[in-house]
């Protein structure tokens, strides 16, 4: 770790920086949470295949899990950061605990409790939610420790999204091209293999990330953010809504995006699009390589833009792009012959281009949001002197999760209108006109509405690139004062 100014390492600056390899390894942390989340987006198939639960009941448990998640987020944000170790810092122990809980939930729901009914299924699901919440708290603490340099922060979003996309691509190929032919469908046995793969891959990624944090996640670097006698409280959430306009903007954008993505990213929607409308479920794996390449190119571009104009402006610009691409995709399905996708060259080419751009646009906006969260936490430290990145992000995501809790119920209700009440969509099901419109609403309509809400909210986002320079300058002085006060308090306590 170093504290240097841009390219002049001998000049003291306002920024904490780190080495590139540390960013590359640390950025695997968000991918760990996303990999576990991908497993649980197939909850309808897990519930039906392993426990015999109806789709609507599985959706109810998932929605209850979102509410449970919303409640535990701020509680963990207040309690978890108090777990500080003089040997291992704060972030790494929290990451380890979160991983172990998520791994236990996957192994339990896949191998220990199948056939035992709704209670163990729900317990495992809630254990996953709690583990992910704790893991996220470790991520939030680490993100503000490893670097606050505006030239480096976008790199975390860049690397995180690339890891997430590559994992999604590999999983899509693994599921569609290797496991699907072996098991003959989306069977419970197929899901068990994916679950084990997730547990092992995430263990490796978390260990690499913890190794990257060993220089910055120290007792001294953590304590520099806390002033003796200043406590983080749940009531601070209300204060942030009152005085932090960047925080309010983040809440609105996150809530609208989460509700839309909760519906659009459900595994049943992918089955409806590729397995029912297009009629070639394996095609989703075939095109994943193109979507990943396009996304990587755009992410490199947007994170470069974010360094120059700030994360907020970059997010707004690419949310407009994502909305336009989603509208274009809808018009293509409405007026084109989507049944010829993967059959004829022209419709296939148009779909691959639009689908790649749509996936890339979603990934680039997510990359910008990662940096925005860090900036909002630093802005709160600037305004109040309270270092609470976990509570800032937890409150934003909590309110988003309360709204998105309706996503599972919306999905179940929409599926019920096309006959999927006690079962789930399977490749080869009839593609009726009603199925088409419900699929378009779940896949594209919800995303468009969510992005429009975000575009409106972002007009009140105050954190420009210039403003963040001012924020970090003030925060550097405050950290120095805090560390001096902490050492004085420890010396006074030792003298008694």
How would you name each of these model-derived features?
Residues 2-487, 496:
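Membrane-embedded alpha-helical bundles of multi-pass transporters/translocases
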